[in-house]
């Protein structure tokens, strides 16, 4: 069994935006989708997860609407807004750039400095 990876600070909102960009989901469905996309590797606490959902909705990056879940229960389904799409694009570019910079630093040997 592979060890779970602790989610780096500041990435949860980006991952929620990505999950919702793949199609509308209720809160728990978003959490499950992130787990699936990570190969069940990320450890996400439900308290911080739902706080992030509400924060994204307040910022206008996702919007919620009441509907019926797959088990016939009332649930709030979230979808990405145009502002959320722009934010996801910006966050993805920033994360990709940062990952490349860190990878470049970590790959350096003493004689390459």
Segments predicted by a language model, with ranges:
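Basic amphipathic alpha-helical segments that dock to polyanions
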Residues: 49-56
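Short beta-strand "wing" residues that participate in macromolecule-binding interfaces
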Residues: 64
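Basic, amphipathic "hinge/linker" alpha-helix immediately C-terminal to the N-terminal HTH DNA-binding motif
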Residues: 71-92
